[in-house]
Amino acid sequence: MSDRYGDFVQSSIGKKVAKNLGLPMPTTLDRFESGERLVRGSVLVGRATGDDKSVSESVARILSDVHAEVYVNSSDDIKDALADAGVEAKANTGGDDQFKVLLFDASNISNAEQLKELYEFFHTVARRVEKSGRVVVVGRTPENI
């Protein structure tokens, strides 16, 4: 489906009209194109503490299959699942690194108190998501906890 407004404001006259009227300029989002890597950028992966590692192992296999550049926080125990899947994960040093994807496995969260782990993962890196970046939280339905 075409976006007539988006196409219009991308033209030279459309830019002038939109600017003079104070209209918003839509952001061009990254889209998958055949032949390109599925993830074009770094992925920061985190995991809630807990005994069940099945979801983390699945996530690690998927990241291995798409050849993603993976980072982990130093305190995160998802490193073992990534290593078992053959993913070489780099340490997130907390510098100026930008991430295309923030991915958190929340499948071990079973009560509201454990939601603090989500906060601890995202609050330091939320402003370091690249344009057209993604924030993904993987979890279970309440019936399966």
How would you describe each model-predicted region?
Residues S2-I145:
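Rossmann-like short-chain dehydrogenase/reductase
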